[in-house]
Swiss-Prot record:
It is found in: Cell inner membrane. Residues 48-141 are annotated as: Disordered. Pfam families: ZipA_C. Keywords: Cell cycle, Cell division, Cell inner membrane, Cell membrane, Membrane, Transmembrane, Transmembrane helix. The lineage of its organism: Bacteria, Pseudomonadati, Pseudomonadota, Gammaproteobacteria, Pseudomonadales. HAMAP family: ZipA. This is Cell division protein ZipA. InterPro entries: Cell_div_ZipA, ZipA_FtsZ-bd_C, ZipA_FtsZ-bd_C_sf. Interacts with FtsZ via their C-terminal domains. PANTHER family: CELL DIVISION PROTEIN ZIPA. The gene is zipA. GO terms for biological process: division septum assembly; FtsZ-dependent cytokinesis.
Length: 289
């Protein structure tokens, strides 16, 4: 029986499809069980908050009310210029009560992450190149005063605010760890090692978190902030902070606002980046002078 051109094409097509299916099966099997964290740039494609909600400006009242948004003030944030030793002394009594709770704090590896969902953060520490240990020690001993603070606030759209357990789970997935001044910090390493890149405080006074009562804790807003001078690679640290804030707002139904209490837009984020570039330029000019 003579095989025509049509039959040959059908046979070749079947072989190609089988090869593709086999290759896909091999790749899926090879990558099974591996948890990868990557900075998800796809969140930049999320619709701006202006398109989903009308612009809301925080009102002037500072008295907490379940029907009003909290009054956010940059001065309410913990001082970025406070030394670690001062933070330890001022919170030593409270820290003693929370040590036991911190032992039970879920670790990154203990979280039930959705492997099929978008991965936002990288577990690789080489995103922030490490300096020599001697240089790191010198920097810790002589920390320069903070000249500028970049603030991104996330405000809950729900009157009940962000619930403690859900908030804790979300920020732990973003690599933040409970630490100095009873607030959360994002270090170079997802494990909580290395220099602090940025921090997150409770935007409602007194501005701290109590892990001993986290199950009953709730807040209407939190504030992410990055001080300049601060991390050795501020632009990369800022990108990680933006991703953490967007992740929280996206998953817990929050709204991003800038340091002027206006809705955060792509233009606002770009303006923040320009502030970092300008600060680095001024710092370089001062060093040369």
């Amino acid at each position: 029986m003579e095989i025509g051109l049509r039959e040959w094409l059908i046979v070749i097509g079947i072989i190609v499809i089988a090869g593709i299916l086999f290759d896909g099966w091999r790749r899926m099997r090879g990558s099974k069980g591996k948890l990868k964290f990557r900075l998800d740039r796809s969140f930049s494609n999320l619709p701006d908050e202006e398109e989903t909600t009308s612009a809301e400006v925080l009102g002037p009242p500072r008295v907490l009310d379940t029907h009003k948004e909290p009054q956010l003030d940059e001065h309410d944030l913990p001082s970025m210029s406070a030394s670690p030793r001062e933070g330890k002394r001022s919170n030593s009594d409270k820290r003693g009560n929370s040590d036991k709770k911190r032992k039970d704090e879920p670790q990154q590896g203990d979280l039930n992450l959705d492997l099929d969902g978008p991965s936002l953060f990288t577990g690789r520490d080489d995103d922030f190149p490490d300096d020599k240990p001697a240089q790191r020690i010198t920097e810790d001993k002589d920390l320069p005063p903070v000249e500028e603070v970049l603030v991104i606030s996330v405000i809950s759209r729900s009157e009940g605010g962000f619930k403690g357990p859900a908030l804790l789970q979300n920020i732990l997935e973003s690599g933040l760890r409970f630490g100095e001044m009873d607030i959360f910090h994002r270090h170079e390493s997802m494990a909580g090692n290395g220099e602090v890149l940025f921090s997150m405080a409770n935007a409602v006074k007194p501005g701290v978190f109590d892990l001993d009562d986290i199950d009953h804790f709730s807040t209407r807003a939190v504030s992410f902030f990055l001080g300049l001078p601060g991390p050795r690679h501020p632009k990369q640290a800022f990108d990680v902070m933006v991703a953490a804030a967007r992740k929280l707002a996206h998953e817990l139904d929050g709204e991003l606002k800038d340091d002027q209490r206006s809705v955060m837009t792509a233009q606002t984020i770009e303006h923040y980046r320009q502030r970092i570039v300008e600060f680095e330029r001024r710092a370089l000019t001062q060093r040369r002078g």
